[in-house]
Amino acid sequence: MPITTLTNISIPTEGAGSNSSLLMPKLQYRFRVFLDNFGTSGAADGTREVSRQVVDVTRPNLSFEQMTIEAYNSRTYLAGKHTWDPITLTLREDANNNVQKVVGQQIQRQFDFYEQSSAVSSGTYKFQTRIEILDGGNGANGANVIDRFHLVGCYVESANYNTLAYATNEPVTTTLSIRYDNAIQFGADDDFIGIGSSETRSTNASVGGTAVTG
């Protein structure tokens, strides 16, 4: 007789198969970050150096401004313009200054601090960021991407070179705040999932999300 008790380690829901087993979660430590066209050269070597020195990264945070419509005896709310909050990327500095060189190149693209001159247009310094969650593969068993946020129109909003201290055993780090124009989410096969996926858009006025059933 098979042991089926593991299917009960779940959350009871309504309908058939209410005790199906839990889904495998994505793991926070299985990830990588690529900064495409980051620095002056935008070469693959510079991108790889930065990717290898990543400590942590925050994923995109999206919010909608609130629109209030006043009415007789009441009010209703609509979703206004959206805002993508900056992500935070922490990099571990290396003794050969490879990371600092690439980061410095990118900041100099945005503003030349020696000559005190700025870029002609944003297209000359903006880059792209890819935040990918992996399946755990490595070496001969190559890693597969199961989720990717692709951020476009990126620039360094702030660079924090952090702290030095005698009482610590930790490496030196640099923290970048990266502002971006838009973010799209992809799945394992580069299919659009979540944000960016094609959804049916109603062209007729209708009342949605207001009916209560049960």
Where would I find each of the regions flagged by the language model?
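Glycine-rich, low-complexity intrinsically disordered segments
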Residues: M1-G214
